[in-house]
C-alpha cells in the first residue's frame, strides 16, 4: 500500500504548473521511506528527494510525529535566540481562539499531506502569533519548506481528525499544525517549489 501511495504522491500537483518535458521518472520505494524513518535523527520532518521538473521543483517528504502534549500542559521553555527575526501577529486578537500546540506558515510552498500511519488532529487556518522566521541557512528554509514563520496558531482555524488514507491540501500562506496525537501520525508531504528555493537535486542521506 505504501509503495502505491508514494508513487501517487509524486504525481500530485502536476496540473497546477506547466511542465517542461522530462525524459525520465523519479521513484521513491516503500523500502526507502522506511530507511529514512529508521535512520537516527533529531527532527521529525525528512525530505526524501527534490526533483527538478523544469518550471518548478517538487519535493517529497515523510514526517513521523509522536504524541502531542496533553491539553493544558505547559510547552517546554526555549532560550530566546537573539538573532531570530520575528513574524506574525504581535498581540492576541480580542476574542480569538488559541490552538493547544504551535504551527507554521510557508511563504511559497504548498503541501499535500497523505496519512500512511496513525492519526491525529490537523489544524489549518488562523494566524501565527509571536512567530519566528526560519533562518536563511536553516534546514527548514533550504531543504524542507522554504522560508517559513512558526509560532502559536490563533484565530479562525479549523481542526479535524485525520487517519490512514486521508489527504489534505494546504496552500502556501495557510497556518497549520497538529494536536491530539495519542501515539503517532506518519504522513507523506508533497511540496511544489515554484521559486526553486530548495536544494537542487537533494536526496536524503539515508537513501543515497
Question: Which positions does each model-derived feature cover?
Answer:
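Bacterial N-terminal signal peptides
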Residues: 7-16
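Short alpha-helix capping/helix-loop boundary micro-motifs
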Residues: 153-157
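His/acidic/aromatic-lined binding-pocket segments of jelly-roll/cupin-type domains
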Residues: 102-105, 111-114, 159-160, 167-168
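A short, N-terminal "cap"/entry segment at the start of jelly-roll beta-barrel domains
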Residues: 19-105, 200-208
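Bacterial N-terminal signal peptides that target proteins for export
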Residues: 1-6
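Short, conserved beta-strand element in jelly-roll/cupin
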Residues: 106-126, 137-150
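A short hydrophobic beta-strand segment most commonly corresponding to one strand
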Residues: 183-201
